């Protein structure tokens, strides 16, 4: 915000500016100390900021005599101070009532994800010594002196001791029962299994902090209360064991104007005690072919650290779809390309594959490679499909778990790469080259027509004898024509805005309908049309020809549009100039307004015709067809070029680009 010279500013504006600067200085200090958990100091800063906010708001800036850019800027500052005052008061009330602490302190109070196991020496002790020695340790794990461990009843209920030969089981890993399982950390004995932690450990599941602690403008877009696990990858490529299933939520801040002031992102992802800021088109996210979502670990200062998020198969399908849709909107989500290499499938830490098993034909990717290597992100792929096979159970009941089996990333597909018939490519290239030539010819023809109109008008003016006395045009008529020009111009702009809105809605609806039409429409096509005797897809060849036809029609339509504008501009300009030459300046100006009004009326009528329900349905169907044909458009340069100086398809497309550059800049109105 630019500041005017203070010598000419009223005292009230100076007071408002001073209060504005001091208020936000104290509010920012309060936010910083609040994030560090220093409540009392944060409350003092908030109170000082509220005092300056009230002082700045108390100045009356809406008086009738207070006009000008300086007062307008002061009113904007007061409006911002009012909004900030409401948020600061709400946060101060929360701090004074002790309802919540800062988000970071809440996350530090989450119970430990990994309990402390009893020492291995306990296996060598007698049952009597076991019951006495393990009680304090279990009480320490539980975090409180539970009756089962410390009370008198805890000693008689001594549990069997595991044999020293029994190996310790690996940390908890992701399994098909992740939504309900992983709430026991146990080790086997001769008579069964028993938990190494108390019941309180299972009851005290981590819960997300209250949404009120984030401010009044925080909006929770999705909350999955349980069934989400995370694992960590360090710069050396080592992968940690997955965490216990916990909650996941995505929060968005509604007031974007405060993002810069409060130094916060537009939204964030929270999985238990891990946070990740979400900035549209900037926050990188990789969806692996094995179903895990990989994020850079921004909570650690070290570079090369990553976090994987795994959703349980027991979660509703709607939750998974909503989660991925939100990631597409609020981050830069990429899909991992298929890796056609024979290597071990993705292994959850703690599960080992057995060398006796035959190698699997899989295209899975180790998460350490996919997360630490930037080359694994496919920049252009939107259809990454997984072709992995399921893990097998061995005789000792240890199971190799493949995440792609549990959380499908994309529906598996066994389709081979589609080969197009030669005739389809030839026809498509001929259509595109022909359309480019037609468009170029239309524009060039319009240019020659415009020059002919100019020459003809010049010769006509040479034969016309100007009037000795310019024609007097009534001021009322001149004023009426000018008003008509302005009114029709406004109507044309408004109708164009309405048409743009209808087109935007139709485009969105068409893009949403296209995948469903493609999915269900392919089921209606007979197999005989999908493949010919040579194994080539005749249907895909027809789709390529159709896509090229659409491209060619668009090119010709642009040429027609450009040619029409060129001719209309020349006719209008020469008509006005001829009338001005014959009847004087006033008559020429009236003619100019009348011609512009007629053009505006025509554009308005054309736009209104494209606003109705029928036009909406047409545009939706057209956009659906265009979206279906996007995958079949020819974008590569053809390898065969005719000899003898013949122009290739790519060269003709360059001519089409020149057509766009040669459009006259003095166009009246754009349809």
UniProtKB/Swiss-Prot annotation:
Biased amino acid composition, Pro residues: 159-174
Modification N-acetylmethionine, positions: 1
Pfam families recorded: Senescence (PF06911)
Biased composition (Basic residues): 384-393
Entry-annotated residues carrying Phosphoserine: 126, 474
Protein biosynthesis is among the record's keywords: no
Biased composition annotated in UniProt, kind: Basic and acidic residues: 118-128, 650-671
Source superkingdom: Eukaryota
Cross-link (Glycyl lysine isopeptide (Lys-Gly) (interchain with G-Cter in ubiquitin)): 360
Signal peptide per UniProt: none
One cellular component term from this protein's GO annotations in UniProt: cytosol
Domain MIT, residue spans: 16-94
Motif LC3-interacting region (LIR) in this chain: 193-200
Location relative to the cell: Cytoplasm; Midbody; Lipid droplet
Residue ranges, compositional bias (Low complexity): 143-158, 369-379
Residues covered by region (Disordered): 110-175, 346-421, 635-671
Biological processes annotated in GO: adipose tissue development; BMP signaling pathway; collateral sprouting in absence of injury; lipid catabolic process; lipid droplet organization; lipid transport; lipophagy; midbody abscission
Entry's Gene Ontology molecular function annotations: lipid binding; ubiquitin protein ligase binding
Assembly notes: Interacts with ITCH and WWP1. Interacts (via MIT domain) with IST1; leading to the recruitment of SPART to midbodies. Interacts with MAP1LC3A and MAP1LC3C.
Domain remarks: The senescence domain is required and sufficient for lipid transfer.
Protein name per the record: Spartin
Organism: Mus musculus (Mouse)
Lineage, broadest ranks: Eukaryota, Metazoa, Chordata, Craniata, Vertebrata
Gene this protein is translated from: Spart
């Amino acid at each position: 915000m630019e500041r005017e010279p203070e010598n000419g500013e009223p005292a009230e504006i100076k007071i408002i500016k001073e209060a504005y600067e001091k208020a936000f200085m104290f509010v920012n200090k309060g936010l910083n100390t609040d994030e560090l958990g220093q409540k009392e100091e944060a409350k003092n800063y908030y109170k000082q900021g509220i005092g300056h906010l009230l002082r700045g708001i108390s100045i009356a800036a809406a008086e009738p005599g207070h006009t000008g850019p300086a007062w307008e800027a002061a009113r904007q500052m007061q409006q911002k101070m009012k909004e900030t005052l409401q948020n600061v008061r709400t946060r101060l009330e929360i701090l004074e009532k002790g309802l919540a602490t800062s988000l970071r302190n809440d996350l530090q109070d989450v119970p430990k994800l990994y309990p402390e196991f009893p020492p291995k020496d306990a296996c060598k002790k007698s049952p009597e010594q076991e019951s006495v020695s393990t009680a304090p340790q279990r009480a320490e794990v539980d975090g409180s002196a539970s009756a089962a461990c410390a009370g008198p009843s805890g000693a008689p209920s001594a549990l069997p001791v595991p044999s020293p030969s029994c190996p310790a089981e690996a940390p908890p890993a992701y399994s098909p029962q992740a939504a309900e399982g992983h709430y026991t950390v146990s080790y086997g004995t001769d008579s069964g299994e028993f938990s190494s932690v108390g019941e309180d450990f299972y009851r005290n599941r981590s819960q997300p902090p209250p949404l009120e602690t984030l401010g009044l403008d925080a909006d929770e877009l999705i909350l999955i209360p349980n069934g989400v696990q995370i694992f960590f990858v360090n710069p050396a490529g080592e992968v940690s064991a997955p965490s216990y299933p916990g909650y996941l939520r995505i929060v968005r801040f509604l007031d974007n104007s405060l993002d810069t002031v409060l130094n916060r992102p537009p939204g964030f992802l929270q999985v238990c005690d891990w946070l990740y800021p979400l900035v549209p088109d900037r926050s990188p996210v990789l969806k692996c072919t094995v179903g895990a979502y990989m994020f850079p670990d921004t909570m650690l200062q070290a570079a090369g650290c990553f976090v994987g998020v795994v959703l349980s198969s027991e979660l509703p399908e709607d939750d998974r779809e909503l989660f991925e849709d939100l990631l597409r909107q609020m981050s830069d989500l990429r899909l991992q390309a298929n890796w056609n290499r024979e290597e071990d499938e993705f292994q959850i830490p703690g599960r080992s594959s057995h060398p006796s098993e035959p190698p699997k034909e899989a295209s899975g990717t180790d998460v350490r490679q996919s997360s630490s290597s930037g080359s694994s992100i496919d920049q252009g792929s939107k259809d990454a499909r997984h072709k992995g096979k399921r893990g097998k159970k061995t005789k000792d009941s240890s199971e190799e778990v493949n995440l792609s089996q549990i959380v499908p990333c994309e529906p598996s597909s066994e389709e081979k790469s589609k080969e197009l018939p030669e005739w389809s490519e030839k026809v498509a290239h001929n259509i595109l080259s022909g359309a480019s030539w037609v468009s170029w010819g239309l524009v060039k023809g319009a240019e020659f027509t415009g020059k002919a109109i100019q020459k003809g008008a010049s010769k006509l003016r040479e034969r016309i004898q100007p009037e000795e006395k310019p024609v007097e045009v009534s001021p009322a008529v001149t004023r009426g024509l000018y008003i008509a020009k302005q009114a029709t111009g406004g109507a044309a702009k408004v109708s164009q805005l309405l048409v743009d809105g209808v087109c935007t809605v139709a485009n969105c609806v068409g893009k949403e309908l296209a995948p469903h039409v493609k999915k269900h429409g392919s089921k209606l096509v007979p197999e005989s049309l999908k493949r010919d005797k040579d194994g080539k897809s005749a249907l895909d060849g027809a789709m390529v020809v159709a896509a090229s036809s659409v491209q060619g029609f668009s090119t010709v339509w642009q040429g027609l549009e450009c040619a029409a504008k060129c001719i209309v501009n020349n006719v209008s300009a020469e008509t006005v100039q001829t009338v001005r030459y014959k009847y004087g300046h006033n008559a020429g100006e009236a003619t100019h307004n009348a011609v512009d009004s007629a053009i505006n009326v025509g554009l308005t009528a054309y736009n209104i015709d494209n606003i109705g329900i029928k036009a909406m349905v047409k545009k939706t169907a057209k956009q659906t067809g265009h979206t279906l044909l996007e995958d079949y458009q020819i974008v590569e340069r053809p390898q065969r070029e005719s000899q003898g100086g013949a122009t290739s398809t790519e060269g003709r497309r360059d001519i089409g680009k020149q057509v766009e550059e040669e459009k006259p800049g003095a166009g009246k109105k754009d349809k």
